Amino acid sequence: MITTKELRNKFINYFESKNHSHQPSSSLIPFGDDTLLFTNAGMVQFKDVFLGIEKKDFSRAVTVQKCLRAGGKHNDLDNVGYTARHHTFFEMLGNFSFGDYFKKEAISFAWEFLTKEIKLPVEKLWVTIYASDDEAFDVWHKHIGLAKERIIRIDSSDNFWSMGDTGPCGPCTEIFYDHGEDVAGGLPGTPEQDGDRYIEIWNIVFMQYNRHADGSTTDLPKPSVDTGMGLERISAVLQNVHSNYEIDLFQALIKKAQQVTHAKDINSPSLKVIADHIRACAFLIADGVLPANEGRGYVLRRIIRRAIRHGNKVGAKEIFFYKLVAELVSQMGEAYSQLIDKRELIEKTLIKEEKLFLKTIENGIKIFDAEIENLKDNTISGEVAFKLYDTYGFPFDLTADMAREKGLKVDEQAFLAQMQIQKQRSKEAGKFNVDYNSLINSQVKSEFRGYSTLIEDAKVLEIYQDDQLVASTSEQVSAVVVLDKTPFYAESGGQVGDKGILEGVGFEFVVEDVQKSGEAILHIGKLVKGRLNLNDELTARVSDKPRLATAANHSATHLLHKALKLVLGGHAEQKGSLVDEDRLRFDFTHDKAISRSEIEQIELLVNQQIRANYPVTTIEISQQKAKSLGAEALFGEKYGDIVRVISMGDFSIELCGGTHVAYTGDIGLFKVTSEGSIASGVRRIEAVTADKAIRHTFTNENKIIAIKDSLKANDINLIDKIKSMLEQIKNQEKQIAKLKKELLSGSSNDIKETNIGDIKVVVANVDGVDVKTLRNKIDDYKSKNTKVIAVLTTTNADKVQFVIGVSNALTTLIKAGDIAKELSSHIDGKGGGRADMAQGGGNNSANIDQALSQVEKFILNNIKE
């Protein structure tokens, strides 16, 4: 039996023998592609190559690509564990041609690999082609020798692939394996095609057309090939098993899952879920994703939590999920060394997330059970599902799973509507919303000269105004200018674009930002003088002060990155950065706040390298060579075959395309200005360098001097004086709280209480107290009365604050939240809360007595009903 590991290697070796360049799998996070949540196909890393935006030094490639389908349009999560072939994470075997070979060679390679290399019986194989693709038919029939009846024409989108509404597209041919008569299902194109007998094992896409906005197509000058074959699926065929979960790799993970969960039934779908999900979670964490409440981090969190619940379902009594990492590393670490490198981070992340979830899941299940007891039909509302998500961290699919087990369904549309309301929070927008890739001619190329000069004579290649290509632009008009060569650095790798001027005879163009599209460098700004025309000769001048300040900050991030690893540990990986002339911002993985002592160590390390005045050296070498030298490749970046390596003495070596100082001493001084959390497991440091670091130090010193002057203190007794003052404040606050309580108690005689049968109703305004005091009084009423409704307000100038309490025994008659809404309507306010407790405030205290009178009527009307 051929193992999954052997099959993976056999595929690579075969295509390398056919002059294909073996390219490593790209990250599960598609860099620079906002259209995808995760990499879900082998062609994703080559998308810009197919579009003609990016050039490679090879025309044939072979990959084994990590893929994930668990979010967005491509989402297999709900089916995982319940079918034979659905997965969140999977490996896609692929061979690619970029304007090299086409249909004859692509089909021949696939057929030879299947029938000669891995020896699949020819009689077990069937193929489909696009209905009108006679060329593919001829290759299969005349060249390969496949019988006509085994070639099925399909006239549907199943056999025609496109990258989008516009762009490269073309017909497909698919190869199917027949599992035999004992398995239900019919041939592709028949009504029974959805059965499991005939399984697609290889899809070959022929990108030969370019689809235009009007729907028409034209031939591509260089047709290409994109193929994909699921490793798990072809492994199942070769290992003579029907389900992907029966292959060697999954069986090892399933056995481990049974061991750590103490499950009794090895065939439980829950064990398949766990075995699948550990792969997805481990690879996501290794690629830099950490659990969060939105975006990719939320997808990871929901996968982790789904696995945990399935573990609990089959008997797990303690945290278990992280215990599968060792087995996963054993199975896949040889092919993916990142699993070995990131093992500690993966295990720590899973342990932390599982502990966090176990703290909340019990409460969430109680809420779920309480809600379904009151159901009037078999549908759980979207509002309840959202409450479970928002308050208890339950992913929607977890709620749906729990509902399905009880024969119920969830209103997903209403849940999504609630999610959409929540998402209306403002988010940081980019500076530009123009799709420059579609705007700029893909053949245009700008040569960047800015590493060695800030001034360059250049020629105007293209001008864009209002998203349109124009021959010239006039004064005071915003435009985008493309030059044949430029010293301007385009925003990339966290470093902002340069600013400066393009000037020529009779014109001046102020460059406000610089972006890149393919190989074109875009100078974005405004013509402030004269007229600018195509082919004009000009001088491009980068503003030197911002560039030099930015370079100092960028070099400092490299030193900071290494210092973080030395002080905090190797897990401190870069998650993002922003470098401009004023500051640097650096995001990295770490699961707790950095102590003052650690910050001091980090600053000391960085400043030691600055004082050492190491030369900052640059070399361009192959990516393979750079990695062998130990160069840090940063998360999310997309690197070419030849990479630029920046070294600072023996301290730091990183792949980087940004601009840097000549010597570390040029940074001057490094000072951390802030440190904090931006997401679960992700911290952010902000810092300044050079003159700004000195000014920051002066500012802090001046603040300390001002504090000493105010407290009449000196360097020796300042801390003691501050501690003494804080202790005095604390004692005074206790005294104030005591006086407020006494004030409220003294006012109790003036508070009107109404008894309606055995229900006590209290509605009153009490001045001179705070909300905490009101809340304590409400709790006091509720503890001393089994049936009480209490509404207490306090006013300060025109502001009103209120607290409302309703005994649990009365919440079926009236809810505190409803009373809050009624009161808010009379005081220009808002408020809300639970059925038994609510609070809020308003901006109109003038009519507080009238408002309370209306609220009392509202209460009495409700309880009398």
Swiss-Prot record:
What EC number(s) are associated with this protein in UniProt? 6.1.1.7
> Which CDD domains does its entry note?
AlaRS_core
Q: Which reaction does it catalyse?
A: tRNA(Ala) + L-alanine + ATP = L-alanyl-tRNA(Ala) + AMP + diphosphate
- What keywords are annotated for this sequence in UniProt? Aminoacyl-tRNA synthetase, ATP-binding, Cytoplasm, Ligase, Metal-binding, Nucleotide-binding, Protein biosynthesis, RNA-binding, tRNA-binding, Zinc
GO molecular function of the protein, one example?
tRNA binding
Q: Name one GO cellular component term.
A: cytosol
Query: Does the entry feature the keyword Chloroplast, yes or no?
Result: no
The chain's disulfide connectivity reads none
Q: Where in the cell is it found?
A: Cytoplasm
Needed cofactors, names only, are:
Zn(2+)
The note describing how and how many cofactors are bound reads: Binds 1 zinc ion per subunit.
The residues that hold Zn(2+) are 554, 558, 656, 660
Give the principal location in a single coarse category.
cytoplasm
Top-level taxon of the source organism: Bacteria
InterPro entries in the record, alphabetically?
aa-tRNA-synth_II/BPL/LPL (IPR045864), Ala-tRNA-lgiase_IIc (IPR002318), Ala-tRNA-ligase_IIc_anticod-bd (IPR018162), Ala-tRNA-synth_IIc_core (IPR018165), Ala-tRNA-synth_IIc_N (IPR018164), Ala-tRNA_ligase (IPR050058), Ala_tRNA_ligase_euk/bac (IPR023033), DHHA1_dom (IPR003156)
Tell me which Gene Ontology terms the entry assigns under biological process.
alanyl-tRNA aminoacylation; negative regulation of DNA-templated transcription
- Please name the NCBIfam families in this protein's record: alaS (TIGR00344)
Family, per entry: Belongs to the class-II aminoacyl-tRNA synthetase family.
Q: Which HAMAP family match?
A: Ala_tRNA_synth_B
| Free-text note on domains in this protein's UniProt record | Consists of three domains; the N-terminal catalytic domain, the editing domain and the C-terminal C-Ala domain. The editing domain removes incorrectly charged amino acids, while the C-Ala domain, along with tRNA(Ala), serves as a bridge to cooperatively bring together the editing and aminoacylation centers thus stimulating deacylation of misacylated tRNAs.
Under which name does UniProt file this protein? Answer: Alanine--tRNA ligase
Annotated source species: Francisella tularensis subsp. mediasiatica (strain FSC147)
Q: Which gene encodes it?
A: alaS
